[in-house]
Amino acid sequence: MLLVDTNIFLELLLGQDKAERCEKFLEKISSGEIKAVISNFTVHAVEAILNDPTLILAFLRNVQNSSGLDVYETRLEEEMAASMLMDKIKLDFDDALHYFIAKKFEVEAIVSYDKHFDTVDIKRREPTEYL
């Protein structure tokens, strides 16, 4: 199982430089070929950044229909634990929360373009490594 960071979705949805690679990677998750998890925090972050009802609905439908993707709903206690990790692992809150979830699910890697994850004990991978 992999944890997919918010920036992978945004790269595609905002039509950024690596959009095509992210699309192919996310298609493998959608088909169930790759198993992955995201947090409800990721869902809300994408919604807030898109700020367009049509794009948000399309994103949510894709998440809902993705065979290989689970959305993990964090509990308040877990968010508190992630906030206490921030200083120790030198990550901001959203990255610390993703790290916390990655540890909880014992993921193989965090798929992200965020190099801050290179400092933790879980491997960071990029989408092209799964194509």
Regions found by a protein language model. Give the residues of each.
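Acidic, PIN/NYN-like endoribonuclease modules and their adjacent C-terminal/linker elements
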Residues: 1, 100, 104-131
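Short, well-structured N-terminal submotif of metal-dependent ribonuclease cores
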Residues: 1-37, 49-58, 129-131
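Conserved glycosyltransferase catalytic-site signature
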Residues: 6, 40, 95-99
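A generic structural signal for short hydrophobic patches within well-formed alpha-helices
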Residues: 9, 43, 117-118
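Structured helix-beta-strand junction loops
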Residues: 32-33, 66-67, 88, 120
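Conserved beta-strand segments of alpha/beta enzyme cores
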Residues: 35, 68-70, 109, 123
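Active-site-proximal, substrate-binding regions of enzyme catalytic domains
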Residues: 41-43, 47-70
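Active-site neighborhoods of divalent-metal-dependent phosphate/nucleic-acid chemistry enzymes
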Residues: 70-113
